[in-house]
Amino acid sequence: MARLHGLQIRLRPGTVPKTSAVAVITGILLSTTFAAVLATADPPDVLDARYVIEPVTNATDVVTPVGCTHDHRGRLLVIESHTHQRPEGYAGPPHDRIRLVEDTDGDGRADRFRTFHEGTRFTMGIRLGSGDWIYVATRAEVFRIRDSDGDDVADQREQLLRLDTAGDYPHNGLGGLAFAADGTLRVGLGENLGASYTLVAADGSSWAGEGEGGSVFRCSPTGTELSRVATGFWNPFGLAFDPAGRLFTVDNDPDARPPCRLIDVVATGDYGYRFRYGRSGRHPLQCWDGELSGTLPMAAGTGEAPCNVVPYDGGLWVTSWGHNRLEVFTPVVDGATCRATSRIVVQGDHEFRPVDAAPAPDGSLLITDWVDRSYPVHGRGRLWRLRLAQGPPRTGAEGWPPLSAGEQRARRLADDAAPADRSAALRDADPFIRQAAVAGIVAAHAPLPAWERIDDGREKLGVLLARRWQDDVDRYGRLPGGGKTESLATADRDTLLAAALADADERVASFAVRWIADERITGLRPGLERLLAADATPTQLLPAVLAALDWLNQDSADPRRYDRAALQRRLEAIWTDATRPPRVRLAALRMTSDVPKGKPLSALAAIASGPAGGDEPLAGEAVRLLAAKPTADVAVTLEEIAANAALPAARRADAVAGLTRLPQGEARLATLLADAAPEVAATARELAPGNAAPATSPAASTDRGPRPAAHDTAAWTARLGAGGDPEAGWRLFFGGRRARCAECHAVGGRGAAVGPELSGIARRMGRSRVLESLLQPAREVGPAFQPYAVTLTDGRVVNGISVATNDRDRTERFLTADGTEVTVPLAEIEHRVPLATSIMPAGLEQGLSDDDLRNLLALLEQ
């Protein structure tokens, strides 16, 4: 079933030949419909008066466009996708095409369209190389093509890189392409959903991996001498060099760790993400902004779903598919790297979906527009031209910051075989200087200083970084022809890691913990156990140690087969053990996501009910675990805690929040409505079942005047301002039926998994963005949370988010809006249609006071 602005076409799978009458009629209908759509479509808003944006094509001239570039004659080449999640009954060509787009009469509109190349699948990127070679990336290969006889059809093809993997998701394989000044090629590889892979170059050099996340690779323009440049990405979908030779990428975000990132990519850099530890990005062994030892921070956060980064007119232009806009980032030197400040130059509506951009010979910027928010190809598309209203754009180095003294030093450290200041550089406060020294050690195969002679924690960390990169090259890299480099002794590696685990510097021990977990070095489990038991172990290191031990104890390294029940049992054994240090028990309890049963539940209830003056952080965490997922088994415990005036008010109020979600909650809370502790009484009143708490209720004590319309995010942001009580926000998030947040979302690892995990989201994205999502839930639905109406063969319809296939791909699981999981046999699915609305209900703010909203935002800033 295709649904096109009211036009519905039902096609039975396998019954429509490529040249059938149905296909012809369908094409005519689509062309007519889409031409009408374009005629009424408004161009996106240009927020900077220096620029103008104009349409280049009609709706069906080039459809579902992805990448674009200009050939050696200045003509536009555009990837036209026909395979990206191709829907049932799709009437387009069977393969992707590269279209040659020309304006032959000079009126600014394209009027000539020819196919330069076709036959590819999941085609992602395209860039002009040297001479007349055009470089193309699909998810499975990088190749180059050219037209040798002048007929405007590519007739020469050379494969440069091949990705051998079972992974087949359209856009998390190979993608981004960029050429350095010396002609060498950089290629981005996405997280590949953790599937094992081998990237093989034309000369037989290769790199293998599994579960580490995305990486950036380097090879010659002919596909030789493959090497890894940097790692720790989710999906470095777009790559570009600025005029000073800095390499930037835009990186899509994990499910629960926005924002997406603009990153200054440096040799041997690790940017923190590991797919093996899950999609959320919140695992203790993952980070997103350089929080973990040995990782590097982002240059800036970007809009949702950035697809490419393009240098133009003195700035880095980023196409934000998810937020319907073009952002311009201005690099600002910060030591040996660049941060960036941003501004929105073009903002469109929900039908502006920019993917790629290419500076044209005439000084304009050509932009591809996917148009629709749906991932499957849909037969629509646009090309836009952005130009300066007056004069030409800045070119060359004009407008770009020159390399700072720190950046120049970093390049020398990375390139020189034996710089005199390498040891000092490893001790430098700037992580990018230290990383450059590491890159130099790796490139020169330089010997490492003796561990016992190093007295500086940063230098020790640098030695570990270099040793690990060398170890990765030995284990996962292959030389031209397939030969291995000389292997470093595993025994030496493990001896070094054992010493690092015992080091007094937390940064050193933290890096060792992560390395041991990443490589599943089970022989060093005793060292992790000693670290967990030691009184001197820093509290902030404990979650990583616990997570590493859990990973070593897993039967499989495949994150798709992760045994979460076994993790919960191991954590229970720690937090129920009164002989362990309280801070270790607290760390384990915070990592516990589910209320246990049987004997562990009794132990949890005893901790939660502990007397005042005891270990309050542990007791408070126990109450919150019980309250976040209350069941009939814990009702009595929560009632006793809530009613016990001898306990701290905060603990009692959290128990009240849990009681409000239980049956007969109103009766349970009746005696607490006038409790002597204001915090308890207020929570009971505000969260009691049946209390809708409209904006005019007494709870809304600071509300003032008429409320803005839901679409006026700026007015709402100004109205609510800053502040708020995060403790009250937690109780609202998990308690009662007014906000209903915990039915779909989680905070701090507690809650449901229907929607994204929200811990710290307002701190990272800003209050306005979070408010917009709450006020207008259907404005932008992340692709991972796209709901579908699934019609079954018996006529039933299931509305929900697809979670996974099971039973050897014979069934599919869906999560519905109320958190219910429904399993459906795949053979019984007749068709599915993406819903235009979110499963998050609209109008939630109508049942919340201004104080409620402030408190929720304060919680989400933590």
Model features per residue range: what roles?
Residues 6, 11, 35-43:
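Basic/polar N-terminal segments that are highly enriched at the extreme N-terminus
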